[in-house]
Amino acid sequence: MGLEEEESTVTSAPTGSLSDIEGTWSLGCTSEKPYEQETVQIHGVDFVLETLVYGDSDSACSVARYSVKKHYTNLVPGTERTLSNETMGYSLTSALKEFSVTPLNDNTTNTMNLNNYCGESSWQTNQTMNVAGKDCGNGANPILNSKVYDRYSFTTESLYLDGSQKTYQKQP
């Protein structure tokens, strides 16, 4: 009785493609405090998330108080994964290139300086400040060049990011 070799085939999991999610995606004014609007731009291996933050009484998102910019680079889509919402998507790794805050009016700037926001008291209106590695009230922010892991799914009209559990709409 001889041993027969069994033919085996290895099937690799599908891998995501950056070209599928390239472009501009946005999330309109949130319905809960803090009121925010977000825009995601994905081009090449770069992913930029810009958040405009509004006042507690500005539910229409009329006048932004400050902006937060997170720029990730070296985007690498990975294999297919099950996301927290039980849909299928893909893993995504990147490195943090920029994490900054910009106060957009004098009142916000004064408040940030009085409260030593992110440990800083030299905020200036419309001037961007790096806040990577600093504590801005929710624990220490990631440091520059730190690896970031997320998962995503998409349709032709929307992009879902698993880490934030937010869905962004495709912009023309």
Language-model segment annotations:
Residues 1-5:
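N-terminal Sec signal peptide cleavage junction
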Residues 6-9, 88:
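Intrinsically disordered, low-complexity regions of eukaryotic proteins
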Residues 10-38, 168-169:
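Tryptophan-anchored aromatic micro-motifs
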Residues 21, 39-48, 149-159:
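Short, solvent-exposed coil/turn segments at beta-strand boundaries
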Residues 28-35, 52-156:
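Contiguous, well-ordered beta-strand patches that form the walls/edges
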Residues 50, 162-163:
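Beta-strand residues in well-ordered beta-sheet regions across diverse protein folds
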Residues 164-172:
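Short, low-complexity, Pro/Ser/Thr/Gly-rich segments in the mature regions of secreted, periplasmic
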